[in-house]
Amino acid sequence: MPSFKVNFSSTNDIGTGIASAAQAGTIRPTMKGPHIADRRTLSRRTFLRGAGVAMALPLLESMTPVFARAKQPGTPRRVLAICNNLGLLPDRFFPKNSGRDYELSPYLNELKSYRDDFTVLSGVSHPGVDGSHSSDVSFLTCAPHPGGGGFRNSISVDQFIAAKIGHLTRFPSLTLGVNASVGRRSLSWTDAGVLIPCENRASSVYRRLFLQGSEEEIERQVRKLQLGESIMDTLAQESKALTRRLSAADRDRLDQYTTAVREAERRLVMARAWERKPKPTPPMGMPSDPSNRNAFMQMTRLMYQMARLAFQTDSTRCVTLLMDGNNSPAIKVAGTKITDGYHNLSHHGMNKDKLTQLDAIDREQMKLLGELIRDLKNVEEAEGNLLKNTVVMYGSNFGDANKHTTTNMPVLVAGGRLKHGQHLAFDRTNNYPLPNLFVSIMQSMNLPVDKFATSTGTMQGLLPA
């Protein structure tokens, strides 16, 4: 049977990106990714070519750009999830009273200008998530017992969202870090429980977002993507043939593997579609990366800027940021001399000097969060501003890092189409499930989701009536 090539000759901007990426490659019929109805934008002049024959196609749904077909009405909705994996001093973060008339705590007072733009949560945690310092890997997955033997993670909420809307943007998601231990710690995990490495360099994020690359570099990348697709196709065929000879348990393992293969295949296809589409014009120059890991606050500010630019240019709608204090030395904080590593300070044992230093670190983080809220709010969009269309979740896997407790997690939610200006106080002994927040966030993004991980519903008091 002759192999066929699909010749894309469209001149629309999405079609052009796919055209140039696909012209040199053979589209194999067994590959899931390039299925015409789901994965390609076809020109009305598209032909099937093979063995000297060119056959025109009838008018197909796929001749409408997939990015136009799938585009949700109105302004895009986004999410930014931030985790500081060494927590905050609880008595200085949580308000003493609840409701709309709560009194701002010392830390929340740093955000007083934006009181009506955020909600603070108390008495929340992930059911079954313990594991001490390992618990940060479950911050967005909610997978229980991360410190236990044989633990296997599950999909993080950002990747769950990206699977639904990631095709609408150049990057389905961005996984960022500040001093994150690459390959060991991340907030983002695939549906097969595989860690997605953090990008710690703001300059690298900037390059991905805005620098196009030369024609030769683009061609080289396209060839790599084509080779990757071919490999994925071969792997899929081989695994199908192998299945018939395996036990039930091995078939389950192989199914997990092929799921990862299909996900990689899908990402390859989307990458080809975007490879030649022009990148947006950068609103600012390339950032300069700090040379020392003690510039924790400077790196945090830069990553907040990169997240804002990614949303502002609609390069992605899902961003995670892990601030890894475990991997940070004595960090710089203006006005305070920090004499010990961040992790050691978090185990303060009520030492007055350590508490003073830790308080300065926590307050500086709140100030930076305030800057982020301000900057998002200052970007006007068709329906309000960038903050109104972006849910920002800031929190920690630790309720109290000094005691390694993973209950009573400090969580603040800003922006988006949620009810704000309140303190939602739940039972600090019998905690309310934090996964319910994730369901509410997704529903506020117009995603038809009723369940995620160990959720029991939506979060009480957060969604507008």
Model-predicted segments: where are they?
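Ligand-binding pockets and gating/stacking loops
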Residues: 2-465
